[in-house]
């Protein structure tokens, strides 16, 4: 990981922001004002969602998800030495299969309002 990436993430985190991926949960692990959230779903739900969004066959969608998951896990491990998706690295996990994709933004907004972040 380049030092410019680390610096960019740390600079962004000086103000309220949302950072997707890039090992930000590990880069910012020592900060008190950070909330690390992992969004996940059952594999079958993910396959169906990708099939619909990208007009793919079941096998092509499954292959795409498998490849993407492998790349994410590899990238995360390479840069942190940790397992991608390990529940111990996150403050909150949102399972869109259980909660519904459409409900997750509302859940987060309610949580942030409760903590008076917004």
Describe the predicted segments one by one:
Residues 53-55, 109-111:
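Short, solvent-exposed amphipathic alpha-helical segments in soluble enzyme
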Residues 26-28, 35, 39, 85, ...:
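Surface-exposed, interaction-prone regions with an acidic/low-complexity signature
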Residues 57-102:
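Small-molecule kinase domains that catalyze NTP-dependent phosphoryl transfer to phosphate-bearing small molecules
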Residues 110-118:
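Short, charged, intrinsically disordered terminal tails
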Residues 54-57, 117:
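Arginine/glycine-rich "motif VI" loop of SF2 helicases in the C-terminal RecA-like domain
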Residues 6, 101-109:
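Short, amphipathic alpha-helical "lid/cap" segments that border enzyme active or binding sites
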Residues 2-3:
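Short, small-residue-biased leader/transition segments that mark boundaries at the very start
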Residues 10-54:
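ATP-dependent NMP and nucleoside kinases share a basic, alpha-helical "lid"
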């Amino acid at each position: 990981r380049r030092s410019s990436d680390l610096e960019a993430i740390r600079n962004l985190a000086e103000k309220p922001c949302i950072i997707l991926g890039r090992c930000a949960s590990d880069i910012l692990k020592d900060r008190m004002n950070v909330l690390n959230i992992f969004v996940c779903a059952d594999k079958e739900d993910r396959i169906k969602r990708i099939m619909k969004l990208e007009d793919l066959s079941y096998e092509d969608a499954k292959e795409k998800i498998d490849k993407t998951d492998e790349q994410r896990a590899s990238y995360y491990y390479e840069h942190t030495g940790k397992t991608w998706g390990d529940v111990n690295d996150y403050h909150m996990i949102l399972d869109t299969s259980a909660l519904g994709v459409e409900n997750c933004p509302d859940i987060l907004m309610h949580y942030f309002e409760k903590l008076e972040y917004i």
